[in-house]
């Protein structure tokens, strides 16, 4: 009888998601935000995403053996709750709460999950809910999905889970062993988030903007070492400045921030607006440099011996999306291969919790080869959505879609690209993307003007054929998920300038045809036309919105922007007066 496990995340009041394993195979996974059209879906439960997973598998709630959740009760007899209370002594209400009522959030979350499951048709008397510690779920999402057979070092860094903020361990023969954890407020991810807020961005959304701003600054201009240290095996955040709660927080316009007024006294007012200007570009560079330095020191201390032995590292948690750190990690002599869970944030813990429970029950999970795990739609679905849409889109079904789209792109036009199953995780990887020809001068600016309106200093990224990668990027390392940056060779910097960042790197997706044949074939056509089998690729959404899920979402976005071309499966939609390239057949 098949072992069916539904993973549900959402305990930390953001990024709820669902994932479904049947006999170790990941059948479906999706974030709630995509269905409810609310980025991060804060304070929601994963109802729509769980419903999709069940429908995708063609099963009923009664077919599910276990519901795995990535949040667990933490014992009073361990270190975590006492560490929290000691370090937050200046907020006695929080400190006492950690000691006396330290699992209140877990109980509240579990009750909400039960309610959500009841709405889905689960029998509350028969539901088997299995909690997995948050950082164990992150660890499982990295290690168990990596496909590594050797002893594997495991790293988890995020803001925080129940109390833990950082996880060091190893996986061997399918079992995860914990070496060390750090606890709130000693959180490298929390510190990065605090500086993200100081630099004028939102936590959860803005960290990658700080990373993108950093190459424009000079880290040597400001010494951020007072903010955090790693000595004698312990990470300590200076809570005079950051990772603060209660009355210690800096407040502005009724909002409390994760840093203190003392940070303002030291660095000046928090940044406002979209311009990458001084001194803030230097602050971004200094934060990124400190983050990399401390993370690499911690890896050395706790995982160095394992890496020297086997060279395999699995990494998850929100900070695993810091591609500049990942570039430094794979440059280490003792790292042969780094697997970064593509959904490294909290959404990925639905996969991790389910994978952990599957292994615990004796059913190993398959290697995660791709992220095309969400809904897909047929040409008929697309045509029906066009017929119902208020904007009355003009559409045509086209032959040889990859060839026509490549020609449209080569002429400098961005294209909204909607093909196959939606991606799981924050990266658009050729399922729900806005694409452009990276050798067409100004295409990045056109994408910004037509839809993205993003800060121009933020880089656009390339997808490329697996045959192109050895020529364009200098490191031979698997890169299917845009979780690494690579140095771009000098020749290719001039061939595809629209996807090369200020520091000469690109955050690349290297695609094998078997996982997304239509996207691959389109890039092959680009290669025929331009000599470059590379596409500019950014997520299919407007600024501040969740990535597109359905044809209706795509049409709403298309007619709410200045984009001229939308391809959904074989259905091409163009704006009035725009050349549909019908002469190509």
Could you describe each region identified by the protein language model?
Residues 7-32, 36-39, 83, 90-94, ...:
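Flexible beta->alpha loop and helix N-cap segments adjacent to enzyme active/binding sites
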Residues 60-72, 128-130, 309-318, 416:
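Short glycine-rich phosphate-binding loop at a beta-alpha junction
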Residues 99-107, 129-132, 273-293, 512, ...:
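Short acidic-aromatic active-site loops that bind/stabilize oxyanions
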Residues 5-77:
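N-terminal cofactor/phosphate-binding cores enriched in small/glycine residues
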Residues 49-65, 116-123, 299-309:
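Phosphate/pyrophosphate-binding loops at sites that engage ATP/ADP/AMP, CoA/4′-phosphopantetheine
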Residues 285-311:
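Phosphate/ATP-binding catalytic cores across multiple sugar-kinase/actin-like superfamilies
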């Amino acid at each position: 009888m098949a072992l069916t496990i539904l993973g549900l995340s959402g305990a930390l009041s953001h990024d709820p998601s669902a994932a479904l394993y049947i006999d170790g195979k990941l059948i479906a996974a999706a974030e709630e935000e995509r269905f409810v059209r609310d980025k991060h879906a804060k304070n929601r439960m994963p109802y729509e995403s769980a419903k999709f997973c069940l429908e995708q598998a063609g099963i009923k709630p009664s077919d599910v053996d276990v519901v795995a959740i990535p949040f667990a009760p933490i014992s009073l007899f361990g270190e975590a709750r006492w560490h929290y209370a000691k370090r937050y002594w200046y907020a006695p209400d929080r400190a006492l709460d950690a000691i006396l009522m330290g699992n209140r959030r877990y109980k509240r979350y579990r009750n909400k999950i039960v309610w959500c499951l009841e709405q889905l048709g689960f029998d509350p008397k028969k539901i088997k809910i299995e909690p997995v510690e948050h950082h164990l779920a992150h660890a499982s999402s990295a290690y168990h999905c990596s496909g590594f057979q050797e002893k594997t070092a495991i790293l988890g860094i995020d803001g925080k889970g129940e109390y833990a903020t950082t996880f060091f361990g190893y996986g061997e023969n399918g079992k995860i062993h914990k070496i060390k954890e750090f606890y709130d407020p000693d959180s490298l991810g929390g510190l990065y988030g605090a500086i993200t807020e100081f630099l004028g961005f939102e936590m959860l959304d803005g960290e990658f903007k700080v990373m993108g701003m950093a190459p424009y600054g000079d880290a040597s201009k400001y010494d951020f070492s007072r903010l955090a240290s790693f000595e004698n095996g312990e990470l300590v955040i200076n809570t005079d400045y950051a990772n603060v709660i209660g009355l210690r927080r800096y407040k502005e316009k009724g909002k409390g921030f994760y840093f203190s007024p003392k940070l303002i006294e030291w660095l000046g007012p928090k940044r406002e607006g979209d311009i990458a200007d001084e001194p803030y570009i230097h602050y971004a560079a200094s934060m990124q440099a400190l983050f990399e330095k401390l993370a690499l020191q911690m890896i050395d201390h706790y995982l160095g011996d394992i890496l020297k032995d086997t060279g395999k590292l699995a990494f998850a948690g929100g900070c695993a999306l810091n591609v500049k750190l990942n570039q430094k990690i794979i440059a280490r002599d003792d790292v042969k291969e780094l697997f970064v869970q593509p959904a490294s944030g909290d959404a990925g813990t639905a996969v991790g919790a389910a994978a952990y429970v599957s292994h615990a029950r004796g059913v190993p999970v398959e290697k995660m080869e791709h992220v095309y795990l969400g809904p897909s739609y047929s040409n008929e679905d697309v045509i029906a959505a066009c017929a119902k849409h208020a904007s009355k889109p003009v559409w045509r079904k086209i032959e040889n879609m990859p060839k026509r789209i490549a020609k449209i792109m080569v002429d400098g036009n961005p294209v909204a690209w909607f093909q196959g199953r939606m991606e799981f995780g924050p990266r658009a990887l050729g399922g729900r993307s806005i694409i452009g020809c990276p050798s067409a001068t100004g295409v990045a600016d056109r994408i910004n003007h037509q839809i993205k309106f993003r800060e121009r200093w933020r880089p656009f990224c390339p997808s490329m054929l697996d045959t192109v990668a050895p020529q364009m990027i200098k490191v031979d390392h698997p890169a299917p998920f845009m979780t690494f940056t690579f140095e771009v060779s000098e020749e290719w910097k001039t061939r595809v300038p629209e996807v090369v960042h200020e520091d000469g790197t690109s955050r690349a997706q290297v695609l094998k045809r078997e996982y997304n044949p239509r996207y691959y074939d389109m890039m092959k056509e680009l290669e025929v036309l331009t000599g470059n089998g590379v596409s500019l690729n950014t997520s299919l959404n407007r600024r501040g919105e969740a990535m597109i899920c359905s044809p209706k979402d795509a049409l709403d976005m298309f007619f709410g922007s200045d984009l001229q071309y939308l391809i959904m499966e074989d259905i091409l939609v163009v704006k009035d007066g725009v050349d549909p390239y019908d002469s190509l057949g």
